Amino acid sequence: MLKIAICDDDAGDRERIAEDLRVYAAAHQEHSIEMTVYSSAFAMLDAFEKAGCPDIALLDICMPGMLGTELARDILRCSENTDILFLTTSSDYAVDAFALHAADYIQKPYTQEKLSASLDRVIALRQERTWLLLPCEGELHRIALEDVLYIETDGKRRSFSLASGRKLTARLTAAQLQDCLAGRRGMI
């Protein structure tokens, strides 16, 4: 199941993006796409607090109350595993978007082919990632191995420092940690 969220304050744009995503999902049923649509950044953030962040977020940038780049920053604070694609009429925020490691920056009006090509690329990259499941604070956290900067050890406590600045702590034995990282390039 691939969770994709759309956030755009313009009803016409929101419906167009949703329809284009439905067309994409119908042509790529192997991805089993679940779509949610939001009309404001605040509605999207409220939903994420309850249900967790999506795998991919399609965000407008110029929205009342909160820019899409600010929304992306908030999303990435709670989930560094969410890929962000910006769909916007403005070219003014491209540098900010890529500073957030946006997967793409698509200017409106766009074509179905452009959105599909971008989604194909992002989904292919997601499938190539190596994922770790870490038991932290009573929950399982799924993190991309490439996001782990370093691991600190204190007894059975392992603190994983992530590229986002977040730190996750898991209780793992040395053997469990070794199993978790076995065969992963760059890890000792």
Where are the regions a protein language model picked out?
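Conserved SAM-binding loop
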Residues: 6, 37, 86-87
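A generic structural motif
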Residues: 25-35, 81-82
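Conserved binding/recognition cores within well-folded domains
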Residues: 117-188
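Short, well-ordered amphipathic alpha-helices
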Residues: 15-25, 44-45, 72
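CheY-like receiver
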Residues: 43-128
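Conserved Asp/Asn-Gly motif in the active-site loop of CheY-like receiver
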Residues: 35-43
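Conserved acidic segment of CheY-like receiver
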Residues: 2-22, 57
